[in-house]
Amino acid sequence: MPSCQPGKMPAPWPWWLQLLLCIPSCVAVLPGRAGELKVSTQTGSVRGLSLPVLDGHVSAFLGIPFAEPPLGRMRFLRPEPVKPWQHVLDATSYKPACYQMVDTSYPGFQGTEMWNPNRGMSEDCLYLNIWVPSPRPKDAPVLVWIYGGGFYSGAASLDVYDGRFLTYTQNVILVSLSYRVGAFGFLGLPGSPEAPGNMGLLDQRLALQWIQNNIHPFGGNPRAVTVFGESAGAASVGMHLLSTQSRTLFQRAILQSGGPNAPWATVTPAESRGRAALLGKQLGCHFNNDSELVSCLRSKNPQELIDEEWSVLPYKSIFRFPFVPVIDGDFFPDTPEAMLSSGNFKETQVLLGVVKDEGSYFLIYGLPGFSKDNESLISRADFLEGVRMSVPHANDIATDAVVLQYTDWQDQDNREKNREALDDIVGDHNVICPVVQFANDYAKRNSKVYAYLFDHRASNLLWPPWMGVPHGYEIEFVFGLPLNDSLNYTPQEKELSRRMMRYWANFARTGNPTDPADKSGAWPTYTASQPQYVQLNTQPLATQPSLRAQICAFWNHFLPKLLNATDNIEEAERQWKLEFHLWSAYMMHWKSQFDHYNKQDRCSEL
């Protein structure tokens, strides 16, 4: 769990990043482009701006509303479609991010602050942004980005999500959308109309509906929409593949480092209700029913909810988040695991993958012995405590199984190996093996699946070398940031970014990421019999036979069976101890009686 204090805003961005944002007052609209910057939609007209990129321009339409502001009584409710407007809407600047916790763990450190809101925060936050090639295309493929952030943070306006490079180089339309996070988006009382849960997912769905109805005037093809996201954004993409009411709103899907079946991605209705009630108690609410609880929570200012939301977690852990999607019987008719195994999902082409060190980023947020400011060499005692926090739902037997699986028993006190093992445990458990299981379930239904492992560490990465290729650090290559000369990427990294943008765009166009210009050959499909994947780095495309097959068999098959078999072991042990105590007491009583009998004077035999 992050150790940061919410409410503090990040330090100002360096001047070169501020220039990158190209605020409207700095951008001249060239003659002949003015017509491209006004678009009429079903909800009203919008006027965007022209942004310079490389040796050309793209048109950007920033801050278009797709829902009514979820203010006042609309807090915790399903979103309502935006009402039409009559004026020409100024769409030349980003809108504020949705209210969320701000990471102040390392003040002034851009490695963390690059993920913090950079446009302020508001509950009035349901807007989307569109980047369009210039000149405006006709029926271009559309890529829709859903940001990650553990369902408690994230913003569509982050610099790393700047859509101009991907739009310009690949002649695609890029859309980024906002959705409510934390308690505002995922506090759930399933069955109650006051706070049904999954509001953030419904925000996303409403944005996808707006795109279906309105992307054509921007030059996009509503029948060629690919939804993509990273981490909780990837989990969201997977959830729309599962939810029957979302499936018709897009054609293809890309999941980067996340899936709907991840252990952190959903909670049960009982757990969701328990967390909502605990938040109310933490905020001093007195309530006898759902309406009274929600009424009290609506009376609190946003920062009060943010300050207390992490207190609802039931155990000390990392890679667990306070308010997440709930299995409500509506958006989700069943658990993601059950829906995937039964084939109850949208059958389509899927591109998915992970980065090399998925766990390292999370280790510094609470595991003993870890810090970005040292080598984080981990003692055996800290390793064992780290395992317990990394698998918080596991009983002692399952925890021991994880320790057994990841320990080098010939060198168990090696602090570097203990650090690397915890990196692997957190990454395998929370990201890699859920993604592998998702890919396997899709491949079994003969859907086209393409898989990757991104294992290039950026030359300008701010995180220490021991963290390797951390969670989230393929995104800059997908969005083309290395093409910005001021960010000091190497020529090889610029080429890697160009390749990755081509892969993603080719997939959006055709359902196959293969780049015809790539001499390395075709990107193989991932099948049930041949679960192949490619490595994405500065070297030529290389195919590998399977992704952590042995270790994912442990997480996806063995450990669930072990947990199921030992689910009642603590109760059985308690009953055994109670019965043993009763038996022991009985035996002590019998022995006492027997000793007393032996001491009695007895008549001699006649």
From Swiss-Prot:
UniProt membrane topology term: Peripheral membrane protein
Signal sequence, start to end: 1-28
Protein name: Acetylcholinesterase
One GO location term (cellular component): plasma membrane
Biological processes annotated in GO: acetylcholine catabolic process in synaptic cleft; choline metabolic process
Organism: Bungarus fasciatus
Glycosylation sites per record: N289, N374, N484
Subcellular localization(s) per the UniProt record: Synapse; Secreted; Cell membrane
A Pfam family matched in the record: COesterase
Alphabetical list of PANTHER family matching this protein: ACETYLCHOLINESTERASE
Transmembrane segments: none
Gene3D superfamilies: alpha/beta hydrolase (3.40.50.1820)
Similarity-based family: Belongs to the type-B carboxylesterase/lipase family.
SUBUNIT field: Isoform S is monomeric. Isoform T can form oligomers, including collagen-tailed forms.
